[in-house]
Every structure is written in structure tokens, then in C-alpha cells.
Amino acid sequence: MEFRILRYDDLDRDTLYDILALRAEVFVVEQRCAYLDPDGRDKNCYHMICTENGKMKGYLRILPPGEFFKEASIGRVLVTDRRKGIATEMVRRALDFIFKELRQDTVRVEAQTYAVGLYGKFGFETVGEEFMDEGVPHIQMLYKRKS
């Protein structure tokens, strides 16, 4: 498996198409969330793609501080093959990127509640109450790296 983190301007058309198609497949079709996925933030984010033999296996987006929350954030996490550790590896690499490249020690996510365990493995803690977003239960989680 190959993992790459790219800025929006570094995405070629085919990769961008694959990202948007995969996001639509998971969030719009599977989860039946009828919302505008391209939310205007993609151009200011980093995009992690996981590929194997030229096929996209996973994706997540890294939002720099101030783009959505005051802290850096991870969102739109999805994989084509579940329960194979791909999401865990992508989150691990995203955190490493945030710590080393963005020089941030705090990360906030709005996790779908079924994914609390994924983030909990890394030390994220829930903050606030569960809420509904596009009909799907979510909760905010916060990670503060220890010095």
C-alpha cells in the first residue's frame, strides 16, 4: 500500500475524481446523506490517499488550524476495505503529519459515533454531547499531545 499526502493544487484530475467518487459512494450512497460534499474547504486542506495497485483504498482530509476548528482536524475518513487496519494507519500517518509538518499538538475531530474506538486508540477523548449531522450521530473528540 502506498500513502501520499497532497495539497489540493497537487491533485491531478483523475485523483480528484477518484476522491470525490469515493466520498460520494460512502457518504451519499451508503450512509444516505444528501449533502453537498465539496464544502469549499478542500482547496485549503491536505488530502491523504491510500492506493494499492493503482486503486484507491482509502482517503482522509487534514484541515489546518483555523480551517474548521481553531485546532488542526482530520475528516472525511473512509476506506474501501474495512477491518484491515487501513483507517488506523491513515489516522496514525495524519497525526504524524500534523505534529511534524503543521507543528500542531492538538487535533479535534467530529467523529461519527461508531468511529470513537478508532480515535480512542490514539488517545482522543470525547468532548461535549453527541449530536446529529446529516442524520448521522457524531461527537467531537480532542487529542492533546503530551510533551
Residue ranges and their predicted role:
Residues 42-44, 68, 133-137:
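Short acidic/glycine-enriched loop/turn segments that link adjacent beta-strands
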Residues 1-44, 51-55:
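Short amphipathic alpha-helix that is part of the acyltransferase structural core
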Residues 112, 132-147:
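C-terminal "cap" of GNAT-fold acetyltransferases
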Residues 79, 84-96:
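Conserved acetyl-CoA-binding loop-helix of GNAT-fold acetyltransferases
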Residues 120-130:
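Conserved acetyl-CoA-binding loop of GNAT-fold acetyltransferases
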Residues 49, 55-64, 71-73, 78:
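Conserved beta-strand in the GNAT
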Residues 98-111:
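Conserved GNAT acetyl-CoA-binding A-motif
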Residues 33-36, 45-49, 59, 71, ...:
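Short hydrophobic/aromatic beta-strand element in the GNAT-like acyltransferase core
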